[in-house]
Regions:
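Charged, alpha-helix-forming regions
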Residues: 1-128, 132-202
């Protein structure tokens, strides 16, 4: 079963099929591509001190969800964004890379192409994630879920609305992926929460 568990020696074990791992890798690459747009300060001096030349909410709705305004008042929001957006993007990139890099190490080249002849998509990957990386995974999974939720316009009635869709509707599959990411977040958060009683692996 895919997900995370705490081994008896305290290590965090991640388990995914090749197919699930490839999907997560693809999602992180989409997040990285999105975060790479429009963040380079025009002034080299601003780049040195980490100040962005951007002071407005991104036009892309997903990017706006990932990098929201901190204040309702436009002037305050713009000023805060200039001083924080660059570092916020860098942190989110680091979270995405933490997921992508370990998947790249464990998937192997043959598993990166889901159409490769003879590939067993259900074959499981097992790898250890450090406590530090696990926290980065938690944040990265959240960014993926926010991105999908924004694209799908997920609201309070989402479960009923998407359940009513036919299996042929691509939005239903994307919503199932959205729900799966939420489940992964929940499991990992439980493992990282002190005094919790997560599923324990040998």
């Amino acid at each position: 079963m895919s997900g995370f568990s705490r081994k008896r020696n305290g290590e965090i074990l991640a388990t995914f099929s090749h197919y699930e791992g490839a999907i997560l890798k693809s999602l992180t690459e989409q997040i990285l591509e999105l975060l790479g747009e429009g963040d380079a300060p025009a002034d080299p001096l601003l780049a040195v001190v980490g100040i962005s030349s951007n002071d407005s909410l991104p036009e892309d709705p997903v990017l706006a969800r990932l990098l929201p305004d901190a204040y309702e008042e436009e002037r305050d929001a713009a000023e805060f964004r200039r001083y924080t957006e660059h570092s916020a993007r860098e942190k989110k990139r680091a979270h995405a890379h933490a997921i992508r890099d370990i998947l790249m190490e464990n998937l192997g080249d043959h598993a990166l192409d889901l159409t490769a002849p003879g590939l067993n998509k259900r074959e499981e990957l097992h790898f250890i994630i450090s406590e530090e990386k696990a926290h980065m995974w938690l944040m990265g999974l959240n960014d993926m879920r926010l991105a999908l939720g924004t694209r799908l316009n997920v609201t309070s009635d989402a479960q009923e609305r998407f359940a009513a869709l036919s299996d042929e509707n691509p939005d239903k599959g994307i919503f199932n992926l959205f729900a799966w990411l939420g489940w992964l977040q929940e499991i990992l958060l439980e493992i990282l929460t002190p005094d919790s009683d997560p599923t324990t692996a040998r």
